[in-house]
Amino acid sequence: MAQSGAKAADLSREPPGEQKPSPSSRQNEEDLGYNLYPERGSRLKKSTVEESLFTFKHKCQLMLQFAMDTSPYAKLLLGAMKSSGCTVFKDRHFSCEDCDGTVSGGFDAATSQIVLCQNNIHQQAHMNRVVTHELIHAFDHCRAQVDWFSNYRHLACSEIRAANLSGDCSFINEFSRFNFGLRKHHQECVRGRALRSILAVRRVSREEAERVVDEVFDSCFNDHAPFGRIPHSKKDAKFAHRDFENRDRYYANL
């Protein structure tokens, strides 16, 4: 799981069965972070009654739909994925589930599915950030041959991009966490959040995780696709979405 070149997979189609890692033991599941998402693999399926209109699931689905309809970050990513041949469908590619209390979402590359932690996401702004963060992982999965399960450099790069472009490290969010700084504060926030995400989903030493993040940081931090810039605020994201929507008009008039 990702906690939040050539095209690797078309998200509009079911992935071939042989691509799924199918962890053979609890040890393997913990190594890949699946233990943080207990509903993965149908281990904790809930009854229809428990999934009624008044549960976390229904609220999660409503907030997801609102994010897809109104968040400029999410709208740009959904449009970019569709343009890349990886159309995202709400019912197929998102799943509201109960998770470990330490995570808010995840991208399951084995199923091309985004997990939204319905028991940990309670506000729309939080949902918007999680959806954006995980859609960046999905976008990377669509556009590149990402080896999520055994190449830590690939995982680190996508985590850096997700932290950088999703608004996770915006001034408002950092202010709410009482994290203050001036010189390269955004870069340090991105580095720290990418590191924590890797440590949460992989059995790897902190020293190795730091080394991998440092190795790929500059190139991945400066990869702003599909935004074309770092969207530091919703206003920036709206401008980026407008530019993305108008990109074909420019070339048509040349």
Curated annotation (Swiss-Prot):
The lineage of its organism: Eukaryota, Metazoa, Chordata, Craniata, Vertebrata. The active site is at 134. Pfam families: Peptidase_M76 (PF09768). The keyword Metal-binding applies. Its EC number is 3.4.24.-. This is Mitochondrial inner membrane protease ATP23 homolog. It comes from the Eukaryota. It comes from Danio rerio (Zebrafish). One of its GO terms (biological process) is mitochondrial protein processing. The keyword Protein biosynthesis does not apply. GO terms for cellular component: mitochondrion. InterPro entries: Peptidase_M76_ATP23 (IPR019165). Coiled coil: none annotated. Keywords: Hydrolase, Metal-binding, Metalloprotease, Protease. A divalent metal cation binds at residues 133, 137.
